[in-house]
């Protein structure tokens, strides 16, 4: 199975809607330490660190995504494993439903959400910012993996 650190949210695999309320696909980014540490089989092989037999996932390094209040501003959340984005009504940086190229390029705080780095901005809606950013905390990730029997 191939895991990518960013792209269009795999809606079918996750069992969620393909598009947001504006008909555009959600995008995501996963920390490199998270997406490269899945085992290929029950023997625990295939990850970038040693994983015990029978464990299909192990976080081998700290997550490296950060969510800020503004570009260059204060931290809202640090060391998060994954971020999911709706690029809002203006759709800048989003992909249209059904496929196709990204719609335009955002700037300012919205630009931070599509510039291929590990920094994202989440703040209240305004005339210049309509992105919706959701992140997965490490605690929630560990809780769900334990509940699913994927972590000891």
Region locations from a protein language model:
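Short loop/turn motifs at secondary-structure junctions and domain boundaries
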Residues: 7-10
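Short, surface-exposed interaction loops/tails
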Residues: 24-25, 30-152
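Short loop/turn microsegments at loop-to-beta-strand junctions
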Residues: 13-15
């Amino acid at each position: 199975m191939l895991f990518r650190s960013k792209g269009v949210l795999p809606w079918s695999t996750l069992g969620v809607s393909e598009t947001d309320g504006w008909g555009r696909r959600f995008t995501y980014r996963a920390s490199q330490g998270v997406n490269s540490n899945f085992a290929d089989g029950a023997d625990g092989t295939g990850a970038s660190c040693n994983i015990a037999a029978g464990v299909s996932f192990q976080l081998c390094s700290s997550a490296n995504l950060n969510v800020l209040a503004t570009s260059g501003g204060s931290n809202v959340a640090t060391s998060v494993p994954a971020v999911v984005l709706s690029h809002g009504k203006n759709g800048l940086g989003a992909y249209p439903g059904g496929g196709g190229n990204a719609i335009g390029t955002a700037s300012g705080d919205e630009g931070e959400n599509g510039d291929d780095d590990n920094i994202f901005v989440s703040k209240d809606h305004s005339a210049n910012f309509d992105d919706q950013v959701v992140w997965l905390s490490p605690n929630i990730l560990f809780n769900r993996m334990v509940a699913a029997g994927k972590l000891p």
